[in-house]
Design a protein with these regions (language model features):
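Active-site histidine-anchored catalytic micro-motif
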Residues: 7-114
């Protein structure tokens, strides 16, 4: 598989790259206040029906603003909330650059309001 690295593993000071929340807040896609965000997430998951008893191998979930996709994302995550996983791989599209290959973040972390 060919990949394209976006070189976001570290900065000039050789400190790990931290991607800060880009769309949190009152006019964003999700709340910036931890207590409000946690309450929203719990309500979406708790309000969803459990589909089956077996452990899902994969999960497809929307990633739009919670006002648009919260109930659907809650249903998806409700299916895995009772299980633990050793490895989780998150795959998402690029919204800003058209990529011919896969982009992989070699190191770093995503910061959330939580």
């Amino acid at each position: 598989m060919e990949t394209t690295s976006m070189h976001c593993g570290s900065n000039e000071d050789n400190k790990p790259y931290i991607r800060h929340p880009a769309v949190a807040g009152p006019y964003g896609f999700y709340p910036s206040k931890p207590d409000v965000l946690l309450n929203d997430i719990r309500s979406y998951i708790d309000g969803a029906e459990k589909y089956g008893e077996s452990k899902p191998f994969g999960l497809v979930s929307p990633h739009a603003g919670y006002v648009y996709s919260g109930p659907v994302a809650g249903w998806a995550y409700r299916q895995i909330v009772d299980f633990s996983y050793k490895t989780v791989i998150v795959i998402s599209p690029s919204h800003f650059v058209r990529l011919q290959k896969v982009s992989v973040m070699p190191a770093g972390a995503y910061q959330t309001p939580l």
